[in-house]
């Protein structure tokens, strides 16, 4: 923890095409080595593919996918005496979104499609339908929290 003042949150401008702040934040997660234009091309390309396949608002599907991936609880390690316990804690809303975006991008990168836009579109569609690797990750995290419910009295 820093001993100085806490750094102010930077304001993230809405993305130019859809006017969505959450989509702009997602582009920052997709971006590598500061290449924002490449990240925009990937995300907009993925949303176009989603629109082609589903014939509905791609932003709606994106938000539905994020909700399906975002975890409600997670486990944190807490050392008590000589033992380390996995203590389940509730995830605050900003971290929920950050984790969902991170998992979505990570599992999209591991898919087999040809381009990143296609991988991202595939993972978005799978997540919106409640399947896919990112949704499985959320279920695993929830299962870990459920299994360690006995240690929930070791609150942070």
UniProtKB/Swiss-Prot annotation:
Biological processes per GO annotation: translation
UniProt KW keywords: Ribonucleoprotein, Ribosomal protein, RNA-binding, rRNA-binding, tRNA-binding
InterPro entries linked to this entry: Ribosomal_uS7 (IPR000235), Ribosomal_uS7_bac/org-type (IPR005717), Ribosomal_uS7_CS (IPR020606), Ribosomal_uS7_dom (IPR023798), Ribosomal_uS7_dom_sf (IPR036823)
Cross-referenced PROSITE patterns: RIBOSOMAL_S7
A Pfam family the protein falls into: Ribosomal_S7
GO molecular function: rRNA binding; structural constituent of ribosome; tRNA binding
The keyword Ribonucleoprotein belongs to this UniProt entry's keyword annotation: yes
A GO CC term attached to the entry: small ribosomal subunit
Entry function: One of the primary rRNA binding proteins, it binds directly to 16S rRNA where it nucleates assembly of the head domain of the 30S subunit. Is located at the subunit interface close to the decoding center, probably blocks exit of the E-site tRNA.
Self-association and partners: Part of the 30S ribosomal subunit. Contacts proteins S9 and S11.
Family according to the record: Belongs to the universal ribosomal protein uS7 family.
HAMAP family: Ribosomal_uS7_B
Protein's name in the database: Small ribosomal subunit protein uS7
Organism (species): Pseudomonas fluorescens (strain ATCC BAA-477 / NRRL B-23932 / Pf-5)
């Amino acid at each position: 923890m820093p001993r100085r003042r806490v750094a102010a949150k930077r304001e993230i401008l809405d993305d130019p095409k859809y006017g969505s702040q959450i989509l702009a934040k997602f582009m920052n997660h997709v971006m590598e080595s500061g290449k924002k234009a490449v990240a925009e091309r990937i995300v907009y390309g993925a949303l176009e593919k989603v629109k082609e396949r589903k014939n509905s608002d791609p932003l709606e599907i994106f938000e539905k996918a994020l909700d399906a991936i975002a975890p409600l609880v997670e486990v944190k390690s807490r050392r008590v005496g000589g033992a380390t316990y996995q203590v389940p804690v509730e995830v605050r809303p900003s971290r929920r979104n950050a984790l969902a975006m991170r998992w979505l991008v990570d599992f999209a990168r591991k898919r087999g499609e040809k381009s990143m836009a296609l991988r991202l579109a595939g993972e978005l569609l799978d997540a919106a339908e409640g399947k896919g690797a990112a949704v499985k990750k959320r279920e695993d995290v929830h299962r870990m929290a459920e299994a360690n419910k006995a240690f929930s009295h070791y609150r942070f």
